[in-house]
Amino acid sequence: MTVDYYYNVGGFIFSVSLPQGVDAGSLLPSFNPFRCEAVQPEQCLFRITAQEHPQVPSVLDGDLLDESVNDLGYTSLFAVSDGYRVEIRHTSRAAIHHLQADSRFTSAVATVFWEDCHAGSVLCSMIRIVYSQAVLLHGAISIHASVVSHSGYAYLFMGKSGTGKSTHAALWIKYIPGTELLNDDNPVVRIQDGTAWVYGTPWSGKTPCYKNQGFPVGGMVRLRQAAATAFLPRQDIEAFVLLLPGCSAIRQDKILYGALCSTLVQLAEKVPVALLYCRPDQEAATLCFTMLANKKIDD
C-alpha cells in the first residue's frame, strides 16, 4: 500500500507516492515547506511512484545519453523505447537506484532501496530530475544559479561550479540592506502572463534555503572571475548564450530542448541579462546591484 503526498513548487503541483510506513517529512525534509492539499490527477504536472518492494528490471536496456558526477551523485541517463531511464548512486560504491519515466516526464517509477542510508537524497535527486524536464513544456526552466531577493524583485547569479555564485549572493546580503537569499542552487524560472518569475525550490545545494516564495526577475547575471570588475549588459543572441549553460534539459530530446530554447528566447527579451567580471568583494556586489536594481543597463 502507498500514500500520496502533494507538493507545489513554482506553481506546479506534483505527487509522490511512497510506501506506507515511509515518512515523507523525514525522508524529504526540504520538501516540507512545499506540501499542499491533494488535487485531481489531471492537475498534477507529474506523478512519481516509489516501489514498496523495489525490484530492478531483469533487462536494463537503453542507449546511454549521459554520465555525470555532481551534486545529484553518480548518474547515468538512458533513452529507452518508452521514455528514459536513470541510474543514481550517492557514492561510487553505493547501491544503484533506478528511475523510469515516460518521454514527457509526466509519470515515473522509482526503484529505491530503502535500506540505503542515502535513500532520501537519492529520491530527492530523482524528483529533481523529473521536475526539471516536466516543467520545460510549460514555459519554465530549472536553472543552476544562486538567487537573492531585494525590494520585491529577485536576481539570479549563474556560472560554472566554483565561480562564486554563492559568494556573490552572500556579498549582496552582507553589503546591500534588505537582501535575502531565495535559493542557493536550483531555482525554477517561468514565464507567467508575459512576466518572468523565479521561485524557490526544495533543491538548494549545500545551503538549507527552502523557501516557498516567488518574485519577478529583476536580472540574470553570469559571473566570471577576473582581476578587475566589469559589468557588461547583453541582449538578444548574446543574452541567450549567457543563459543557456546551466539550464536543465536533455539535449538529445528535440521537443524538450526546443521548449527550453523557446523559453530562453523570451527570458532574453524580458529581463536584463549581463556578464559580470568580478572579484569576490564589495565592489562587485555594489556595482551589480546598482546596474540591475536601479535599472541602469544601457540599451
Give, region by region, the residue ranges found by the protein language model.
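A noncatalytic interaction/capping subdomain that flanks phosphate/NTP-handling catalytic cores
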Residues: 1-156, 161, 171-180, 188-299
